[in-house]
Amino acid sequence: MKIKTLAIVVLSALSLSSTAALAAATTVNGGTVHFKGEVVNAACAVDAGSVDQTVQLGQVRTASLAQEGATSSAVGFNIQLNDCDTNVASKAAVAFLGTAIDAGHTNVLALQSSAAGSATNVGVQILDRTGAALTLDGATFSSETTLNNGTNTIPFQARYFATGAATPGAANADATFKVQYQ
């Protein structure tokens, strides 16, 4: 009798555990994955790391930007081109587009307004590899870079440029760019 009771208890326990193991899987929504890119018919493809980048200009004292024409130290950044084919084009140049600080400074990006307060009398300049400040109209291209087959890097620099005595605050600016192949 004890063996029969023990067998019933063991069989009951096994059937309960197998029922739990056979329980239906639970599926929940996890989120969204965005895939973003572009297929281009060009001599090169802009590297994904160059498409959307942030250049850290750091903190600069207002005393360094106390008068019109004063600049901060320049910070380098690159636009990398991949899978270049020199049979298609042998040179590349880049144009930047952004809002100029004013009509007299078409090569100085205006700062974005900030809830915390933006710096005034200062903007951002973009310099090509020759050190020339680029006009930010999207149509004035940098000096040309001779392409090699494969990967190419086009160097630029950015710096703050004072249009008067700078006041403190956030100093962020944005520009888009396009590449011209010849």
Swiss-Prot record:
One of its GO terms (molecular function) is identical protein binding. Coiled coil: none annotated. InterPro entries: Adhesion_dom_fimbrial, Adhesion_dom_fimbrial_sf, Adhesion_dom_sf, Bact_Fimbrial_Adh_Pro. GO terms for cellular component: pilus. SUPFAM superfamilies: Bacterial adhesins. Keywords: Disulfide bond, Fimbrium, Signal. It is found in: Fimbrium. Residues 1-23 form the signal peptide. Belongs to the fimbrial protein family. Fimbriae (also called pili), polar filaments radiating from the surface of the bacterium to a length of 0.5-1.5 micrometers and numbering 100-300 per cell, enable bacteria to colonize the epithelium of specific host organs. This is Type-1 fimbrial protein, A chain. It comes from Escherichia coli (strain K12).
